[in-house]
Amino acid sequence: MSAYVIASYDIADPDHYKDYPPAVGPIVGKHGAELLVADMDATPLEGNKRQVYVVLRFESEEAALAWYNDPEYAPVRKIRLDSTANGTAVIAKGFVPPSA
C-alpha cells in the first residue's frame, strides 16, 4: 500500500535552506519516491498557513521510513531542520476503499 510523507514548514534561514532542495532530490529518488507536491504558494483553508508544503509518495510505509532513516539523508535532514521553523512531517497510509 502506498504511503505518503506530508510535510509543512516555514523557512527561517533562506541562505541555509537553499542547500536542501538540490541535496534531498537524489536521496528521495534512490528510495523510489515520487514528488507529488512542492508548493510555496498553497491556498489556506483552515489553520495557520506554512510557507512550504511537500507530499512524497512511497511504495510503502517501510520505504518511507527507509528514506527518512537513511544515513545519507541525516545531514540533509539537519539542513532542513536547522533552517526551518513550525514544521510537521507525517507518514500517512494510502486509502483502500472496502470492497462492496
Give, region by region, the residue ranges found by the protein language model.
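Generic beta-strand structural signal
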Residues: V52-V54, G87-T88
